[in-house]
From Swiss-Prot:
Record-listed E.C. numbers: 3.6.4.12, 3.6.4.13
Taxonomic placement: Eukaryota, Metazoa, Ecdysozoa, Arthropoda, Hexapoda
Protein name per its UniProtKB record: Regulator of nonsense transcripts 1 homolog
Modification after translation: Phosphorylated, probably by nonC.
Amino acids binding Zn(2+) 2: C114, C117, H136, H142
Chain segments carrying region CC/SHH/C: 114-142
Miscellaneous comment in the UniProt entry for this protein: In Drosophila, the definition of premature stop codons in mRNAs appears to be independent of exon boundaries and of the EJC complex.
SUPFAM superfamilies with a match to the protein in the record: P-loop containing nucleoside triphosphate hydrolases
Renumbered residue ranges of the record's region C4: 160-190
GO cellular component: cytoplasm; neuronal ribonucleoprotein granule
Binding site for ATP: Q456, G473, P474, P475, G476, T477, G478, K479, T480, Q646, Y683, E813
């Protein structure tokens, strides 16, 4: 749209209601604004000293300047404060009522009133990312505004010209083609109607009233730069606190923020806990915070003026269908939720009844189905004047609270081993690990399930032998099959009942179906509110199995009578409940496996069942208190399955999330050093699609169980590179704030997504094969409407396509995935597109092909996306243009920054709440770092004691973490990393002189800083395994890996050099070393003893080595000062180590792991102490 389209304000004409009957209720807003001026004043707050000096010079020279004149003219507006007055009192009192509640600016042309709370806010940014009025509307979830009466447009309520909607986030303006008229219309449906063309309005020119999180300048002016400098300075954090205050006290002011206790935060979660009491005291308040937030959310969601459609279900129960208004609440309606329906009209007596939701809005309709518990006196003849209340149920929170208390006070709630490990008291080197001694199955697969691959067999074997185990299942690696096999083997080996849990009903149902295939006796326990909801495993549900029991005829008769009449007499009801309870106990005690949600495990019906083992699937999506509900049921064996490189739990309360409630138990145990067994063969994605996620998030360890031919669709679609079914379509559309005010949409991207989808449908792809992913709810809702109304094919086809958020697609897969990125702006950033876990999930949902639609110029500013975009560009699949004429984009990106962690690049971006957790220091315990440590002390302690020593700290390998002494100001000693045991002691450093200053900063094992770089120098903690580090499977032939041959050759050459030269330490070392090596590559330094496994143990005067235990698998490391060391022999975080240095790396006990070397890229330390990477020609 040209800026010259409009005439000056004097030439504007306006529609008159009496003269214009094109649209009923039409109205326009008069304006005095010159529409040729589309410039926006600067929002910078800073004024340099040079500007101030220039003004001073002009004042002394008598130079008159318009800017200077404006400053002097505005001096009268300045508020000065007498010393005797109360601070800030005179300023507040003298402000007019229409002053901005944030900053105090009160120019009528720059302020807007919120119609919901009647407060005024300005259109200036201050120090925030958006204007103050937009900040308020978003945070308070208000939507309507009125302009000031003394402003250019007068006192005007902003509303749609056609339908009268007043939500400013959906309003925009359209210029008429013939007349200089500005018409306000909502985005959908009014601006999208074809009838606009008949009104001489150009609907293609529709623009939102809000751009860059400010109202357009011609609508509401922005305060001058001087005005913003003189105004009260308020930060985004203060705005948040003020908005929270207003929810409790509408009259609260800025001064109330200074009161004590306003910004109190709950105690942060810890990494380790002293005992169960401290554990409960930490998580209990967080659970209560989340419960209070959830209660407020639901109780404030009452909706009025509801129209109802009545129906009767197959079970003869009354069902009310109605449509809820599109709210901006964070609450999502789910099956089984309880609502209360009120009749408040005059045609019938007042009535209310509770029901549970049996239908939720979807692509086919917005109706909500509510099955009433009782239809007595229901006003079925009335269809209007109804109100809906959301009923808050505290069941889940109560169960979490009880589980935390039980964990603290009941010794029988968990075994001693699991109790100590959950508190973080276990040793990081696993030397105190308990193994179950007993027969192992000869065949690890389960009947009627696919045969397991090698990594799956190792995971099953590992889980069966240990009381606590973690299994990491990357996308498409058969996590559910592996879990079902573990459950089958547990039942066959140990007997008893196994409890299987997951955070969501969908995940539980999927796992239940797989376990049922193995012919085990499975019972699915679900909440009573969900008993009427159908699912693929409904026949296994406890209530349905009771109905089908042939043994109890009396119960069957009473059940039939209750179904027919709806209720029983009090005597019959009591008898019915007793018989049903007895039948439930009988079924549960006879079951091999009981499946339920994590919270469902707190059901009283399960309290009497003795569980031998517990398996929690998708444990990464559960909060820690949620996981504790099944854990405290007394089992001796716990298996957690998940993937902490994917999305974690959802916590609604931001305070609780900041305090660490959003951290899962799985992730904390990983940080504590319990290494997960990773499944490593993916069967979902085309090999080209798996390459980036594998190398970026999983250290290149994912193998392809399918070949390209298995994942090739035979259809007519213009892939830029036919052998690579993927591309990134460059789209330059601008983002807009969605109707909620808290989300975003991009109309240009939506149009491109529709064209791509239509092309696939015309090529023969079925709608259910396509999935459309977008990170933003606003874009999801817009896409649903856009494709149904604007799509060129029948709307029914588009309705059958699943359009969902990234979070909703976790655990799902589709043949074709189309992703809309949405974000496209100059200054606001890319929001949670920056989350590496969210990107990982989005990239790993597709089986046959993926298409990403977005603005690469904006996305490439973020390092994570820069890697992905360069990956696509290198493969010539970064394209632009129409589908029929796709051409390689000429956009050039900044070269990706070289990451220290080139082996596990994704972990560079992974951040966790635990990164800031402080470990509890129990006086006198094995974690107490306040005292010195003896030579033989087996501890997880620091090894940075200063002075001249050699690996003599209290570490997990006898004396020093990882078998080496951390260098201090005068010691660069024992840098053996536990591989071959170069634990040289004392004296000068390895270079024969004073230790370099960078050594302490780069080479010590900083257990907290490895997650968050800014904390790198702050902590000397005891987290032996970084979040991104996991077990690799041993003895898998190199041919299975899609690694560059250059990498393999480099490792082979490196090993040959090591074997020829051996390990040595130049300079004056200590009196001897104690080390662990393999064969003759062990470091000399004392008497050599060779055990039966062919490993050698060297003993001598040194103190930095690690005793070799059977089952350990150690690679020999070359001295860093002589030869490049494989990166996997160092920590794959900014400072650290590789897993192969730990005992138990080899899961095939007694054999040597080769995988670290095969997957590594060579790295060496340069003269300045930084890692220098010898990158290969194709790093991906």
């Amino acid at each position: 749209m040209s800026v010259d389209t409009y005439a000056p304000s004097s030439a504007l004409s306006f529609l008159d209601m009496d003269d214009n009957e094109l649209l009923p209720g039409a109205d326009t807003q008069p304006t005095q604004y010159d529409y040729r001026d589309f410039t926006m004043p600067s929002t910078s707050q800073s004024q340099t000293q040079n500007d101030q000096l220039e003004i001073a010079q002009r004042c002394s020279a008598g130079d008159s300047h318009p800017r200077l004149a404006s400053i002097t003219n505005d001096l009268a507006d300045l508020q000065f404060e007498e010393e005797d007055d109360e601070p800030g009192s005179s300023y507040v009192k003298e402000l007019p009522p229409h002053a901005c509640k944030y900053c105090g600016i009160h120019d009528p042309a720059t302020v807007v009133m919120c119609n919901n709370c009647r407060k005024w806010f300005c259109n200036g940014r201050g120090s925030t990312s958006g204007s103050h009025i937009i900040n308020h509307l978003v945070r308070a979830k208000h939507r309507e505004v009125t302009l000031h009466g003394e402003g250019p447009l007068g006192e005007t309520i902003l509303e749609c010209y056609s339908c009268g909607v007043r939500n400013v986030f959906v309003l925009g303006f359209i210029p008429a083609k013939a007349d200089s008229v500005v018409v306000l219309l909502c985005r959908q449906p009014c601006a999208a109607q074809n009838s606009l063309k008949d009104m001489n309005w150009d609907q293609e020119q529709w623009k939102p009233l809000i751009a860059d999180r400010c109202f357009l300048a011609w609508l509401v002016k922005q305060p001058s730069e001087q005005g913003q400098l003189r105004a009260r300075q308020i930060s985004a954090a203060q705005i948040n606190k003020l908005e929270e205050l207003w929810k409790e006290n509408i009259e609260a002011t800025f001064q109330d923020l200074e009161k004590p206790g306003i910004d109190s935060e709950p105690a942060h979660v810890l990494l380790r806990y002293e005992d169960g009491y401290q554990y409960e005291k930490t998580f209990g308040p967080l659970v209560r915070l989340e419960a209070e937030y959830d209660q407020k959310l639901k109780e404030s969601a009452t909706q009025e003026n509801i129209e109802v459609r009545w129906d009767v279900g197959l079970n003869k129960k009354t069902i009310a269908y109605f449509t809820l208004a599109k709210t901006d609440s964070d609450m999502k309606l789910m099956h089984g939720d309880e609502l209360r329906l009120h009749y408040v009209g005059e045609l019938y007596n007042p009535w209310s009844e509770i029901g549970h939701v049996i239908k939720v809005p979807d692509n086919f309709g917005d109706d909500v189905g509510l099955e009433l518990k009782s239809s007595t006196n229901a006003p079925v003849k009335c269809t209007s004047n109804f109100t809906v209340d959301f009923i808050w149920k505290c069941t889940s929170f109560d169960r979490m609270t009880r589980a935390l208390c039980k964990f603290a006070i009941d010794r029988n709630s968990v075994s001693n081993f699991i109790y100590s490990r959950l508190l973080g008291h276990g040793r990081a080197d696993s030397n105190d690990e308990v193994l179950f001694r007993g027969p192992q199955p000869k065949l690890f697969s389960a009947p009627h399930l696919p045969d397991l691959n090698r990594s799956q067999v190792y995971a099953v074997k590992h889980a069966l032998q240990r009381p606590l185990s973690l299994i990491q299942g990357p996308p498409g690696t058969g996590k559910t099959v592996t879990s079902a096999t573990i459950v089958y083997q547990l039942v066959k080996l140990h007997g008893g009942t196994v409890l299987v849990c997951a955070p969501s009903n969908t995940a539980v149902d999927q796992l239940t179906e797989k376990i049922h295939r193995t012919n085990l006796k499975v019972v699915r326990v679900c909440a009573k509110s969900r008993e009427a909801i159908d699912s693929p495993v409904s026949f296994l549900a406890l209530h349905n199995q009771i109905r089908n029991m042939e043994t109890n005829s009396e119960l069957k008769k009473l059940q039939q009578l209750k179904d027919e009449t709806g209720e029983l007499s009090s005597a019959d009801e009591k008898r019915y409940r007793n018989l049903k309870r007895a039948a439930e106990n009988q079924l549960l005690e006879a079951a091999d496996v009981i499946c339920c949600t994590c919270v469902g495990a707190g059901d009283g019906r399960l309290s009497r069942v003795k569980f031998t083992s517990i398996l929690i699937d998708e444990s990464m999506q559960s909060t820690e208190p949620e996981c504790m509900v099944p854990v405290v049921l007394g089992a001796k064996q716990l298996i957690l399955v998940g993937d902490h490189c994917q999305l974690g739990p959802v916590v609604m309360c931001k305070k609780a999330a900041r305090a660490g409630l959003s951290q899962s138990l799985f992730e904390r145990l990983v940080v504590l050093g319990i290494r997960p067994f990773r499944l490593e063969v993916q069967y979902r994605m085309h090999p080209e699609l798996s390459q980036f996620p594998s190398n970026f998030f999983y250290e290149g360890s994912l193998q392809n169980g399918v070949c390209a031919e298995d994942r090739r669709l035979k259809l007519d679609f213009p892939w830029p590179q036919p052998e690579r079914p993927m591309f990134f379509l460059v789209t330059q559309g601008q983002e807009e704030i969605a109707g909620s005010g808290t989300s975003f949409l991009n109309r240009t991207e939506a149009a491109n997504v529709e064209k791509i989808t239509t092309r696939f449908l015309k090529a023969g792809i079925k709608p259910e094969q396509i999935g459309i992913i977008t990170p933003y709810e606003g874009q999801r809702a817009y896409l649903v409407q856009y494709m149904q109304y604007q799509g060129s094919l029948h709307s029914r086809l588009y309705q059958e396509i699943e359009i969902a958020s990234v979070d909703a697609f976790q655990g799902r897969e589709k043949d074709i995935i189309i992703m809309s990125c949405v974000r496209s702006n100059e200054r606001q950033g890319i929001g949670f597109l920056n989350d590496p876990r969210r990107l990982n999930v989005a990239l790993t949902r597709a089986k046959f092909g993926i298409i990403i639609v977005g603005n690469p110029k904006v996305l490439a500013k973020q390092q994570l996306w820069n890697h992905l975009l360069n990956f696509y560009k290198d493969r010539k699949v970064l394209v632009e243009g129409s589908l029929n004429n796709l051409k390689e984009s000429l956009i050039h990106f900044q070269k990706p920054k070289k990451l220290v962690n080139s082996m596990n690049i994704g972990a560079h971006f992974m951040s966790t709440i635990i990164a800031d957790a402080k470990e509890v220091m129990v006086p006198g315990s094995i974690y107490d770092r306040s005292g010195g440590y003896g030579q033989g002390r087996q501890m997880v302690g620091q090894s940075m004691n200063g002075g001249q020593y050699g690996g003599s700290g209290g570490g997990p390998y006898g004396n020093s973490p990882l078998g080496y002494g951390t260098p201090s100001s005068n010691s660069m000693v024992g840098f053996g990393l536990g591989n071959g045991g170069n634990g040289a002691a004392g004296g000068n450093n390895n270079f024969g002189g004073a230790g370099p200053s960078w050594a302490a900063a780069h080479l010590h094992h900083d257990s907290i800083g490895y997650i968050s770089n800014e904390h790198g120098a702050a902590a000397l903690g005891n987290m032996p395994v970084p979040v991104g580090m996991f077990m690799n499977m041993s003895n898998i032939p190199p041919r299975f890996y899609n690694q560059h041959q250059q990498a393999i050759m480099a490792v082979k050459q490196n090993r040959a050099i090591q074997q020829q030269t051996g390990n040595f330490s130049p300079g004056n070392s200590g009196p001897g070393v104690t080390g662990v090596g393999v064969g003759r590559s062990a470091t000399p330094g004392g008497n050599k003893k060779t055990n039966k496994l062919g490993k050698s143990r060297v003993t001598g005067g040194g103190t930095g080595g690690a005793p070799l235990t059977q089952g350990s698998s150690v690679c020999n490391a070359a001295p860093y000062s002589q030869h490049p060391m494989p990166l996997s022999l160092q920590m794959t975080q900014p400072s650290g180590f590789a897993l192969s240095q730990q005992p138990e790396l080899s899961q095939d006990f007694g054999q040597i792991s080769q995988m670290d070397g095969l997957l590594s890229q060579d790295v060496a330390f340069n003269a300045s102490g930084e890692r220098s990477l010898n990158q290969f020609s194709q790093p991906y």
